[in-house]
Amino acid sequence: MATYLDFEQKIKNLQDDIESAIISGDNDAISILEKELEKEVSSVYSNISDYQKLQLARHPDRPYAMDYIESILKNPYEINGDRHFKDDKAIVCFLGKIGEQTTMIIGEEKGRGTKNKLARNFGMPSPEGYRKALRAAKLAEKFHIPILMLVDTQGAYPGLGAEERGQSEAIARNLQEFAKLKTPTIAVVIGEGGSGGALAIAVADKLAMMQYSIFSVISPEGCAAILWNDPSKIESATKALKITPIELKKCGLIDDVINEPLIGAHRDKESAAKAIESYFLKAFEEISQDDNYLNKRYQKLMNYGAFS
């Protein structure tokens, strides 16, 4: 059953009415209701607020990394473990083909269903997850295989064990090593891009965001609690943080925005997957034809935070 957000209630009601009209065989009513639905969808999504985009980024039906991997990667071969401690299921690494291009995909996976979510720690990676990602990236570099990174986490796991095993070192190491990888790298924020937990697999030649994704140094709830001592001020915090793709592109922090189906990737996962596949192949072709891409990546990273 589809999940609707609070601002989509009228859309839900119209779709329910259409289903009832279909059951009763009232073709005239179906035609009228479909036009009303199209008008309502256009009205709602053409005036969507930053807070509503946050809700869409967190939508429970939104495609996760594994959804995209299963859709766009042919002949997938999974890489497990960091060769130091364990296999962190919050990070997934697969080697396969996108189109005819051999590709390494590294993604953050939140999981579906209670058991799977617990196994994947709700998409919050531990140090061994980031070390597994680096292991996969180094393997790709060895054979000059392009890397596609799918970013989707509320943040790195803040537990005591993760800190004891070097969470901050693992993130910092990835920032350093991914910046130097001698192979084309493309990162796409597909849902939530939460602070260092997202950055650890987001250093790339091209950094894009899905239309209804977010990227932030802190959650809006955390920001509201710190600045106003009131977590209920989440809407104000969301706007102030400028966490949406449009705002981040204006600031020069991301390269591109990937358009989603009108009412979100969760309503048409196949189209969303095709959009990511198309973006990756186009970006890879552009990067691979540029002999100076490593220097351009370095210059891009050095320009972060610089304003004239």
Swiss-Prot record:
Keywords: ATP-binding, Cytoplasm, Fatty acid biosynthesis, Fatty acid metabolism, Lipid biosynthesis, Lipid metabolism, Nucleotide-binding, Transferase. InterPro entries: Acetyl_CoA_COase_a_su, ClpP/crotonase-like_dom_sf, COA_CT_C. One of its GO terms (biological process) is fatty acid biosynthetic process. It catalyses: N(6)-carboxybiotinyl-L-lysyl-[protein] + acetyl-CoA = N(6)-biotinyl-L-lysyl-[protein] + malonyl-CoA. Residues 36-286 form the CoA carboxyltransferase C-terminal domain. Gene3D superfamilies: 2-enoyl-CoA Hydratase, Chain A, domain 1 (3.90.226.10). Its EC number is 2.1.3.15. Pathway: Lipid metabolism; malonyl-CoA biosynthesis; malonyl-CoA from acetyl-CoA: step 1/1. It holds the Pfam family ACCA. It is found in: Cytoplasm. GO terms for cellular component: acetyl-CoA carboxylase complex. One of its GO terms (molecular function) is acetyl-CoA carboxylase activity. The keyword Calcium does not apply. NCBIfam families: accA, AccA_sub, PRK05724.1. Belongs to the AccA family. HAMAP family: AcetylCoA_CT_alpha. Component of the acetyl coenzyme A carboxylase (ACC) complex. First, biotin carboxylase catalyzes the carboxylation of biotin on its carrier protein (BCCP) and then the CO(2) group is transferred by the carboxyltransferase to acetyl-CoA to form malonyl-CoA. Acetyl-CoA carboxylase is a heterohexamer composed of biotin carboxyl carrier protein (AccB), biotin carboxylase (AccC) and two subunits each of ACCase subunit alpha (AccA) and ACCase subunit beta (AccD). This is Acetyl-coenzyme A carboxylase carboxyl transferase subunit alpha.
